[in-house]
């Protein structure tokens, strides 16, 4: 458990989750390509999605959040993006770690959006099961347990 705690502390140490960080809304394929280039240069990014499941067989992607190790965050306005091929490049890149919590739904909808199978995924929820914590733990509970931080959702 000590190694996992260390990893989580590294991921959270710069205020990316709790501090004051800059964000930028991405609404074009060109801006998405720039964000992907920054993600690849960083070597690791946190990814989360927001989607709507209303009167459809599949969920509709609404927002993709990308967090960088320096604390910066990109918000991708999914309906505004016409060409997801830059994001497909990121998802398929084996040299960039994609960090998600409870990744299954996120990965399913991202695969539908960009068409790429993800490589080099780190799922914080699944990892908990390997270190003696619940493999179904919420992100809020995980942060409370390991970091003694209360996350308002």
Predicted regions and their residues:
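N-terminal accessory regions of nucleic-acid-interacting proteins
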Residues: 3-45, 49
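Active-site-proximal helix-loop-helix substrate-binding element of RNase H-like nuclease domains
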Residues: 11, 18-22, 65-153
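An N-terminal structural lobe/cap that precedes and organizes the functional/catalytic core
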Residues: 50-69
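Short, surface-exposed beta-edge/turn micro-motifs
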Residues: 42, 60-61, 95-96
